Swiss-Prot record:
Residues 1-24 are annotated as: Disordered. It comes from the Eukaryota. Disulfide bonds join C51-C74, C55-C70. Belongs to the small Tim family. It is found in: Mitochondrion inner membrane. The keyword Protein transport applies. This is Mitochondrial import inner membrane translocase subunit TIM13. The twin CX3C motif contains 4 conserved Cys residues that form 2 disulfide bonds in the mitochondrial intermembrane space. However, during the transit of TIM13 from cytoplasm into mitochondrion, the Cys residues probably coordinate zinc, thereby preventing folding and allowing its transfer across mitochondrial outer membrane.
Length: 98
């Protein structure tokens, strides 16, 4: 029961609880987005490091056709692997949230 225009405890608590859930969800979404950016950055760094080491023995002004083909194949391999891992990860998250 409210006296003199002050909200009752149950209404106030319900609103606070709803706001807390909304804030919690926003924080979770922000963390998820930050993790996605960090993962993408890590992927690019790993691809660059590993494919360069594998394909370019002596750096020059540019890549020769053999090095270019090697880098492209390496990149495609990493991207295929990334897609498989990402799909599996998303599936697991969806299963655990249900």
């Amino acid at each position: 029961m409210a006296f003199f225009g002050t909200p009752s405890t149950s209404t106030s608590t319900g609103t606070t609880s709803g706001q807390s859930q909304q804030v919690k969800q926003q924080i979770q979404e922000q963390i998820s987005q930050e993790l996605a950016v960090a993962n993408a950055t890590e992927l690019v760094n790993k691809i660059t490091e590993n494919c360069f080491e594998k394909c370019v023995e002596q750096p020059q002004n540019g890549l020769n056709p053999q090095q270019d083909a090697c880098v492209n194949q390496c990149l495609e391999k990493y991207m295929r692997s990334w897609n498989v891992v990402s799909k599996s990860y998303i599936t697991r998250i969806q299963q655990s949230s249900n």
